[in-house]
Amino acid sequence: MTVASTVSQEILNHCLAIEGQRRLQGVLKVSGAKNSALVLMTASLLTEELVELINVPNLTDIAGMGRILSALGVQVEHSGNGVALNAGNLTSHEPPYELVNSLRASFFCIGSLLGRLGHARVPLPGGCRIGARPVVEHIRGLKALGAHVSVEHGIVSACVKGSKKRLTGAPIVLDCPSVGATETLLMAAVLATGTTTIENAAHEPEVQDLANLLIQMGADISGAGGPVITIHGVERLAGVSNYPVIPDRIEAGTFLIAAAITRSPLRVEPVIPEHLSAVLQKLRDCGCQLEIDQTGISITPGDIQAVDITTQPFPGFPTDLQAPFMALMATAQGTSVISEKIYENRLQHVAELQRMGASIRVDGSTAIVEGVAQLSAAPVTGSDLRAAAAMVLAGLAANGTTKVSGLKHLYRGYDKVEAKLNAVGAQLERQQG
């Protein structure tokens, strides 16, 4: 199955049956980063030339982005783990609502369309329903660059007045280091006249990956990965061949937690350790031995002890690994305190872990987890992407066969997850729900 393929509607009626307490051994391969690949695909809108990406994961979200870009007139061709995008003949500046509604990353199109064409109409985004996740910062930044922006009936309309249809560089100070706003404004600014600075910019590796791609395309960008990004606008961008998407740090972290929760020695590769520093430290703190080299990480779990975590913007502990790490802490010795500081309403997985025997109580955006000796198999549902991953991890550790529903969420972010885990000794089988 190629990245052009989408997982069948059959997954809505299926579940994953997971036989727990199997010891794992071997190497888990990490795919390209979903959150990077999605925004890199939208960057293809900034040039009339061919953009080729490699190490692209095979996910429903990637297929969805391909459909959105195709609807705008982009020629999208998938081959293996590569995707070629040619936006030389755009036919629309408004992605269809029915496609955008299911994918939050679709909103990135507004920055690249506005930068290239001088106008765009983009529906407010969909995706996992985690808290408010507003786009206020994106819009405020686009206005600072000279765009006229209005929101009506769920559609964001933006345009640049004047004959040249080009944005104008400006200083922008974000109220918070939003990844989405940073990436949207970065793409909008690369073709603007003059110089743009983005202060309080997001530091995430995915932002750095986008900047690196744009630089290879001819953009003049400095400071990506730090608090201030400077963009000197250029007249045009060129294409790029075989640009590799960075490894998915969230998938890598999930696999390391899979080793810890099953008390199994595993190797996870490829990994860029600097992208997971906070997670690696917490794994060490809770009793795991890590050996890190240039290509990956070997993990040997010991007796897992409770540790506290607080989600923070990069380089802090990532919110996307909060639910998976909570599953691990549910099996630890002692009591851990897990505080979610990035998104509201991101503790929906607690009730499902409790169904499996986890001892957890919630106080606002904080969960207090008292480790238990054994989780028990139960029918559970992943309410969002990372909650679904947490259910899979809990199922790997539980006594009995756990059935996890909500696979439409899981396949949005984990490439060939059953095959990868089964290859190291797990037993996962998709069944009729």
UniProtKB/Swiss-Prot annotation:
Domain of life assignment: Bacteria
GO biological processes: cell division; cell wall organization; peptidoglycan biosynthetic process; regulation of cell shape; UDP-N-acetylgalactosamine biosynthetic process
Binding site for UDP-N-acetyl-alpha-D-glucosamine: 104, 320, 342
Keyword terms: Cell cycle, Cell division, Cell shape, Cell wall biogenesis/degradation, Cytoplasm, Peptidoglycan synthesis, Pyruvate, Transferase
Modified residues (2-(S-cysteinyl)pyruvic acid O-phosphothioketal): 128
Broad class of where this protein is predominantly found: cytoplasm
Gene3D superfamilies: Enolpyruvate transferase domain
Pathway(s) where this gene product acts: Cell wall biogenesis; peptidoglycan biosynthesis
Annotated catalytic residues: 128 (proton donor)
Keyword Lyase among record annotations: no
InterPro entries: Enolpyruvate_Tfrase_dom, Enolpyruvate_Tfrase_sf, MurA_subfamily, RNA3'P_cycl/enolpyr_Trfase_a/b, UDP_GlcNAc_COvinyl_MurA
Location(s), subcellular: Cytoplasm
Enzymatic reactions: phosphoenolpyruvate + UDP-N-acetyl-alpha-D-glucosamine = UDP-N-acetyl-3-O-(1-carboxyvinyl)-alpha-D-glucosamine + phosphate
Recorded GO CC terms: cytoplasm
GO molecular function ontology, one term from the record: UDP-N-acetylglucosamine 1-carboxyvinyltransferase activity
Pfam family name, one: EPSP_synthase
Sequence positions that bind phosphoenolpyruvate: 34-35
Enzyme Commission designation: 2.5.1.7
HAMAP family: MurA
Family (UniProt): Belongs to the EPSP synthase family. MurA subfamily.
Protein role: Cell wall formation. Adds enolpyruvyl to UDP-N-acetylglucosamine.
Protein name as annotated: UDP-N-acetylglucosamine 1-carboxyvinyltransferase
Organism: Parasynechococcus marenigrum (strain WH8102)
Gene: murA
